[in-house]
Amino acid sequence: MKTNNQVEIIIFKREGNELTFLILKRNPQKGGFWQPITGGVEEKETFEETAMREVREEIGVINDIKLIDIGYSFEFFDHGENHFEKVFAVELKPKTKIIISEEHTEFKWVSGKAAIEQFLKYENNKKGFEKLIDFLNQI
């Protein structure tokens, strides 16, 4: 059975000692739930290239994108297919302008705790946020 490779990119920013995380609400035709940036790896693309493309496409950020590999990935089964998802993070400058794609209806900057406890639908997404927060606390 074929495995679909995907990426998840958690966007964050620092303002003073505070970390906030970007979450996006998918449009109702795509489920209407909150999540980080996600997307599928296209033919001949690396995970890193996909992550960069998805950041450009989904939030309109084209400059100063430095991917952070947080060392977390997961697998899941959906719609009769296996999926492998590698998680990255990107730190944005506090004043970076966000322009969401038609895939989403709104975005919010929230604390990690709020993202995990109030907004994110899927456990694997929550775990990605937890891993990133742990990673950031170690550097």
Identify the role of each PLM range.
Residues K2, R14, R26-N27, E81, ...:
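Generic structural signal for beta-strand residues in well-ordered domains
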Residues I11-K13, K25, E91-L92:
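Residue-level signal for short segments within beta-strands and strand-turn junctions
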Residues K2-N4, P36, H83-E85:
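Short connector loops at helix/strand junctions that flank enzyme active sites
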Residues Q118-I139:
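Charged phosphate-binding loop/patch that engages nucleotide di/tri-phosphates or the phosphate backbone
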Residues E18-E57:
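Conserved Nudix-box catalytic region and its N-terminal flanking loop in Nudix hydrolases
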Residues I10, I37, A89:
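Residues in well-ordered beta-strands of folded domains
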Residues V41-I65, Y72-N125:
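Unchanged
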Residues M1-F21:
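Conserved N-terminal beta-strand and adjoining loop/helix that marks the start
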